Curated annotation (Swiss-Prot):
Compositional bias ranges of the Low complexity kind: 372-381, 403-417, 606-616, 648-671, 783-794, 829-847
Annotated segments matching region Disordered: 1-31, 154-189, 342-448, 606-673, 772-861
Protein name: Ataxin-7-like protein 1
Domain of life of the native organism: Eukaryota
Polar residues composition-biased segments: 355-369, 817-828
Biased segments, Basic and acidic residues type: 342-354, 628-641
Coiled-coil ranges per UniProt: none
Pfam families for the chain: SCA7 (PF08313)
Length: 861
C-alpha cells in the first residue's frame, strides 16, 4: 500500500505538467480528479496536446483505490468500502484471488473469509485459519496456510484483461451474501496451478442451504413482524395473513434441500449472526448424501459421473431421462406421485401450523380491522369457524385472500357493490394443484417456495379501499364517470343479445351447389350464355310422365318470366310438385291441357321459379303507372273470347294426337328473330342475383304438335308489388300467344312473398311428364306471313337487327316428329303489352308470334 500511495505525487506532478500549458489553474485542478483530462481544458489548442496529456495519464498506472474515486458520479462500477478490502482485494476484477473449498460443507469461499465461514457455519468443528493477509502483499503465505485446512480449488492469474467469473452476477452477490456466493472457479489460463476439483453448478446449489433453511416459527411475534416488513402495506392487518400463509418452511429432508437455486438471501445470515444456530447435521448430510434411486433424480452427471441427488421433481433433467434411471422399486411416475402426495401433506401441516400461530397473534388486531371493514363496506360479521384443516380460516376471514388459483376475484369491486365479497378459500394445496398440469415442470411453484425462505405473496398488494373518483365499475378495469352513454350501451347490449338469441343464421337456407354458373350480370347485360342450357346438356332432368287433368292457371307459367337474370328455382323433387288443382278467381283465361296416355316421349322442363331479391336496382326504363296495369287486366279479360275461335278449330284437326304435355321454358326476347326455347337443368339451388331480367315471355309448348307460346311481358314498374298475389300478376300475362318483342325488358324485382314464389306454386307444371328426345330438335321455320298478324317464327338472320345476343347462347327447341300442321293463334289473342310501356320495347313493329303447333288446347271460360 505504501508503494501504491507513493505514486500519487507522481500522478499529480504529471497532471500538473500536462495542464501547465493551460492558463487557468482551476481547470488544471479539475484534471487531478480525472483519469483522462477533459477536452474542455484544451479549448483552442490542437488535439495533439490533449492526446499527449491523455497518454501521459494512461501510461502512469493509476492507483486502484483512486480509480474508484475518479469515475465521479458517472461511474458504472459499484464501489466497495475500504473496510472490505481484505475480502475483495483492491480491484476484484483484476486482482489475484484464491478459492478454497471447505472440507466440512464443500462450500467454495475465499481464503479471506474462510475464518469467518468456519466460525459461523461450523463453530468449533474446524480450527480456524489465521487471519489472512491481503492477497496483493503476500498471496503465497495465505495460500499455504489455507491449504492445511481446506483443499485448494483454484487460482486465477492476475491479468488485467481476463475476467475470473463467467457470471458477473456472482461478483455483485458477494457484497450481500458473502458466504453463500457460488464461484464457478476455472483453472487459470496462463499458469497451471494445483489440480483443481471441478465445482459444478449443479452441485453447488445443494450446498447452499443453511441449517436455518428449515425455519420453524420460534416466536410467532417475530414472524408477524417479518411479514409486516415484507408486505409493506398501509393497512397492516389484512395483508399480513397471505404472506404468512405463503411463506413455506423448508424441512431439512434431503429431498427438499436438494433442488435449490444457488443463492440464499441474507435473512438467514442475520439469524446466524444473531446466534440462532442449529445442529450441524444438515451439512453432514449434504456432504455424505447417498444416492437413493427411489427418492432422487438419479440421472448421471456428465462431469462428475455421479447420479443426480436432487429430488424426483428435478428440474435440471428431463422427464424421459428420469424415467430411464434403473434400480427403482416402482415406476418413476408412481414414485413421483407418492413424493408429491407427501409434500402436499407436509404443506398442509405447515399451513395449519401457520394458521394457528397467526390466530394467536392477530386476535387483538383483527378486532379493529373488522370494525373498520364493517363500517366501510357494510358486510356481514366475520365467521371465525374451523370446519376442516383444509378450510380453516383466520378470524378475519372477511378479507379476500385469493391464492393464485382464484386470483381473479379481486376486492376492488367492493367499493362499488357496497359489500366486501368473501371469496371461498381454496383447499390448502390449491396452489400446487393448479400447477400440476405440465409434464416437465410439475412442482414448479412448490419447489420455488421451498427454495425461498423469505416471506412473499403471490399477488400485488390489494388495498381495502381506494378512491374511485365517482366512477362506476362497468367491467374488468372499465370505469365510467358519467351516464351519457348508458341508454346507448343498454340498447346496443339488448340488440346484440336479441341477435344472438334469435339465431338468425339458422334461418338462412344453405346455398346448395347449382349446375348453373352464376353470372354476376350488370343491369344492361343481355342474356348470359350460362342461363340457357342446350338440350344436349347431359345434366338435363328426365322425369317420368304422370297424367294430370288439372286446370293450369297462367300464374304457373308467368312467375319466372321477367323477375331476375339468373335466379331460377328448379326443384328436382317430384313429390314436392304435386299440386293438381289451382285456380285463382282473378284469372280470366285458364288453360286446361288434357293429358292422355301418349307413347312418344315428351319434353317438359320444370318451371324455373324466380326469387326476387329485394335489393334489385330499379330498371332504366320508365316506370309505368297504375293505369297501365289496369289496362293490362282489361286486355287479359278480352283474351279468352279471342281464344275460343282458333284453338278450338285446331283441336278438331289434331284430336288424334290427344296426349299433350306442357313444356315450359324461357324464350328470351333478346334472341330476336330466331326465338329458341331451352330446358333448364333441374338444379336444387335458390340462387338470386341482382341483374336485369331479360326473360319476359314464357312459351307453353305442347310436345305433340309444337309450340303454343304463352309469351307475355310484364310491364316494368318501380316495385310492382301486386296486392292479389300471383293471381293479379297473371292479369299482366297473355294466356295464349303473347307478343315476343325483341327488345330487352329490364324489369325490377317483383316484390312477391316468398310463399307465392315457393316451389309449391310450380307444382302442377313440374309434375307433368318430362322426357325429351334429342333427335327431334329442329328449328322452327316461318310458316305464315306477317300480314295476317299470325305467329311468325323469327329467322336467325334477323338477329342483326338487335345484335344483343349471339345465336349460340340459346338452345334449339325440340320439335316432335308428329307435329305436321301448324296452328295459328289469332292476332287478337296475343296480349300486346307494347303499348303499355313504350320505353320497354325497342321496335313495336316486331311484335310477332311464334308458330304454334298446338295439340289439343281447350279454352275454358
Amino acid at each position: 500500500m505504501t508503494s501504491e500511495r507513493s505514486r500519487i505525487p507522481c500522478l499529480s506532478a504529471a497532471a500538473a505538467e500536462g495542464t501547465g500549458k493551460k492558463q487557468q489553474e482551476g481547470r488544471a485542478m479539475a484534471t487531478l480528479d480525472r483519469k483522462v483530462p477533459s477536452p474542455e481544458a484544451f479549448l483552442g489548442k490542437p488535439w495533439s496536446s490533449w492526446i499527449d496529456a491523455a497518454k501521459l495519464h494512461c501510461s502512469d498506472n493509476v492507483d486502484l483505490e483512486e480509480a474508484g474515486k475518479e469515475g465521479g458520479k458517472s461511474r458504472e462500477v459499484m464501489r466497495l468500502n475500504k473496510e472490505d478490502m481484505h475480502l475483495f482485494g483492491h480491484y476484484p476484477a483484476h486482482d489475484d484471488f484464491y478459492l478454497v473449498v471447505c472440507s466440512a460443507c464443500n462450500q467454495v469461499v475465499k481464503p479471506q473469509v474462510f475464518q469467518s465461514h468456519c466460525e459461523r457455519r461450523h463453530g468449533s468443528m474446524c480450527r480456524p485459519s489465521p487471519s489472512p493477509v491481503s492477497p496483493a502483499s503476500n498471496p503465497r503465505t495465505s495460500l499455504v496456510q489455507v491449504k492445511t485446512k481446506a483443499c485448494l480449488s483454484g487460482h486465477h492469474s492476475a491479468s488485467s484483461t481476463s475476467k475470473p467469473f463467467k457470471t458477473p452476477k456472482d461478483n455483485l452477490l458477494t457484497s450481500s451474501s458473502k458466504q453463500h456466493t457460488v464461484f464457478p472457479a476455472k483453472g487459470s489460463r496462463d499458469k497451471p496451478c494445483v489440480p483443481v476439483p471441478v465445482v459444478s453448478l449443479e452441485k453447488i446449489p445443494n450446498l447452499v442451504k443453511a441449517d436455518g433453511a428449515n425455519v420453524k416459527m420460534n416466536s410467532t411475534t417475530t414472524t408477524a413482524v417479518s411479514a409486516s416488513s415484507t408486505s409493506s402495506s398501509a393497512v397492516s392487518t389484512p395483508p399480513l395473513i397471505k404472506p404468512v400463509l405463503m411463506s413455506k418452511s423448508v424441512p431439512p429432508s434431503p429431498e427438499k434441500i436438494l433442488n435449490g437455486k444457488g443463492i440464499l438471501p441474507t435473512t438467514i445470515d442475520k439469524k446466524h449472526q444473531n446466534g440462532t444456530k442449529n445442529s450441524n447435521k444438515p451439512y453432514r448430510r449434504l456432504s455424505e448424501r447417498e444416492f437413493d434411486p427411489n427418492k432422487h433424480c438419479g440421472v448421471l452427471d456428465p462431469e462428475t459421473k455421479k447420479p443426480c441427488t436432487r429430488s424426483l421433481t428435478c428440474k435440471t433433467h428431463s422427464l424421459s431421462h428420469r424415467r430411464a434411471v434403473p434400480g427403482r422399486k416402482k415406476q418413476f411416475d408412481l414414485l413421483l406421485a407418492e413424493h408429491k402426495a407427501k409434500s402436499r401433506e407436509k404443506e398442509v401441516k405447515d399451513k395449519e401450523h401457520l394458521l394457528t400461530s397467526t390466530r394467536e397473534i392477530l386476535p387483538s388486531q383483527s378486532g379493529p380491522a373488522q370494525d373498520s371493514l364493517l363500517g366501510s363496506s357494510g358486510s356481514s360479521g366475520p365467521e371465525p369457524k374451523v370446519a376442516s384443516p383444509a378450510k380453516s380460516r383466520p378470524p378475519n376471514s372477511v378479507l379476500p385472500r385469493p391464492s393464485s388459483a382464484n386470483s381473479i376475484s379481486s376486492s376492488t369491486s367492493s367499493n362499488h357493490s357496497g359489500h366486501t365479497p368473501e371469496p371461498p378459500l381454496p383447499p390448502v394445496g390449491g396452489d400446487l394443484a393448479s400447477r400440476l398440469s405440465s409434464d416437465e415442470g410439475e412442482m414448479d411453484g412448490a419447489d420455488e417456495s421451498e427454495k425461498l425462505d423469505c416471506q412473499f405473496s403471490t399477488h400485488h398488494p390489494r388495498p381495502l379501499a381506494f378512491c374511485s373518483f365517482g366512477s362506476r365499475l362497468m367491467g374488468r378495469g372499465y370505469y365510467v364517470f358519467d351516464r351519457r352513454w348508458d341508454r346507448f350501451r343498454f340498447a346496443l347490449n339488448s340488440m346484440v343479445e336479441k341477435h344472438l338469441n334469435s339465431q338468425m343464421w339458422k334461418k338462412i337456407p344453405p346455398a346448395a351447389d347449382s349446375p348453373l354458373p352464376s353470372p354476376a350480370a350488370h343491369i344492361t347485360t343481355p342474356v348470359p350464355a350460362s342461363v340457357l342450357q342446350p338440350f344436349s346438356n347431359p345434366s338435363a332432368v328426365y322425369l317420368p310422365s304422370a297424367p294430370i287433368s288439372s286446370r293450369l292457371t297462367s300464374s304457373y307459367i308467368m312467375t319466372s318470366a321477367m323477375l331476375s337474370n339468373a335466379a331460377f328455382v328448379t326443384s328436382p323433387d317430384p313429390s314436392a310438385l304435386m299440386s293438381h288443382t289451382t285456380a285463382f278467381p282473378h284469372v280470366a283465361a285458364t288453360l286446361s291441357i288434357m293429358d292422355s296416355t301418349f307413347k312418344a316421349p315428351s319434353a317438359v322442363s320444370p318451371i324455373p321459379a324466380v326469387i326476387p331479391s329485394p335489393s334489385h336496382k330499379p330498371s332504366k326504363t320508365k316506370t309505368s303507372k297504375s293505369s297501365k296495369v289496369k289496362d293490362l287486366s282489361t286486355r287479359s279479360d278480352e283474351s279468352p273470347s279471342n281464344k275460343k275461335r282458333k284453338p278450338q278449330s285446331s283441336t278438331s284437326s289434331s284430336s288424334s294426337s290427344s296426349s299433350s304435355s306442357l313444356q315450359t321454358s324461357l324464350s328470351s326476347p333478346l334472341s330476336g328473330p330466331h326465338k329458341k326455347n331451352c330446358v333448364l337443368n333441374a338444379s336444387s339451388a335458390l340462387n338470386s342475383y341482382q341483374a336485369a331480367p331479360p326473360y319476359n315471355s314464357l312459351s307453353v309448348h305442347n310436345s305433340n304438335n309444337g309450340v303454343s307460346p304463352l309469351s307475355a311481358k310484364l310491364e316494368p314498374s318501380g316495385r310492382t308489388s301486386l296486392p292479389g298475389g300471383p293471381a293479379d300478376i297473371v292479369r299482366q300475362v297473355g294466356a295464349v300467344g303473347g307478343s315476343s318483342d325483341s327488345c330487352p325488358l329490364s324489369v325490377p324485382s317483383l316484390a312477391l312473398h316468398a310463399g307465392d314464389l315457393s316451389l309449391a306454386s310450380h307444382n302442377a307444371v313440374s309434375s307433368l311428364p318430362l322426357s325429351f328426345d334429342k333427335s327431334e330438335g329442329k328449328k322452327r321455320k316461318n310458316s305464315s306471313s306477317s300480314s295476317k298478324a299470325c305467329k311468325i317464327t323469327k329467322m336467325p338472320g334477323m338477329n342483326s337487327v338487335h345484335k344483343k345476343n349471339p345465336p349460340s347462347l340459346l338452345a334449339p327447341v325440340p320439335d316432335p316428329v308428329n307435329s305436321t300442321s301448324s296452328r295459328q293463334v289469332g292476332k287478337n289473342s296475343s296480349l300486346a303489352l307494347s303499348q303499355s310501356s313504350p320505353s320497354s320495347i325497342s321496335s313495336p313493329g316486331h311484335s310477332r308470334q311464334n308458330t304454334n303447333r298446338t295439340g289439343r288446347i281447350r279454352t275454358l271460360p
